[in-house]
């Protein structure tokens, strides 16, 4: 949960998640939809899917006991170099590094690394150096101390160099370039897309929702169906096409309900939400994992992305 998310945000989610899934076996036995629902609001849902898959793999391949080595941990879904290194060193005292953003920043300043350190040769060099620094005695404490140094003193802005215990050997400080390090990759402009969504209400008051395919972005989450507009395509035409392709239905596009702007890691969207009339026919999961006709109070039982949660809130408020 702490990957990409601050501690203050994570704590209530963490406590609630453990109430739902108090043990690894409970998590492994749970339905993915229930895991995503418990994760709802944290974002980066691939983390939840990987956590669920890793729990299942630990149960089936390791007898329900977490592997005790870096190599075995690295084979679990969602366990990259950092996570595997942190668990192996802190929980099992294996002499391996745990290189997160804080550690990269400390080492880049300490060694005056003037190349971008997120990827490539410089990143591999820092990982190798970190591996050489980890002591055989209490490797987990060393890794945590290095991370804490980056979080508390060697901060991204205004590093507190006068208080730093390694200031005497810091090459970045000696050269007066510590504030310029680590070198960051040029920030790319995020593309923008217009996306449509249909609030389709049947005569009995039920709403049509669709579940995204597991391999899709936000896979496993539910949504008000729709999709991305093609160049020079009007919003109503886009919505009619998407609903036909996704569910095999014909709809009448009504008035605009709302427009929601939202940013993801690599792109931004304007979500245009329309009230739509159901013209008949039985939905089919043509380009989605599943579909449901759901009463308004029951929408709370499904896991939705943040944009769809805002639509649900509007419906609950009577819009």
Describe these PLM feature segments.
Residues 2-175, 250:
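Catalytic cores of DNA base-excision repair glycosylases
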Residues 167-196, 263, 299-317:
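Acidic, metal-coordinating catalytic segment for phosphate/diphosphate chemistry
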Residues 178-223, 252-255:
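N-terminal strand-loop-strand
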Residues 187-191, 215, 260-271:
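Acidic pyrophosphate-coordinating catalytic loop
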Residues 199-201, 273-277:
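Short, well-ordered beta-strand micro-motif
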Residues 224-258:
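The catalytic Nudix box helix
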Residues 275-318:
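NUDIX/MutT-family hydrolases
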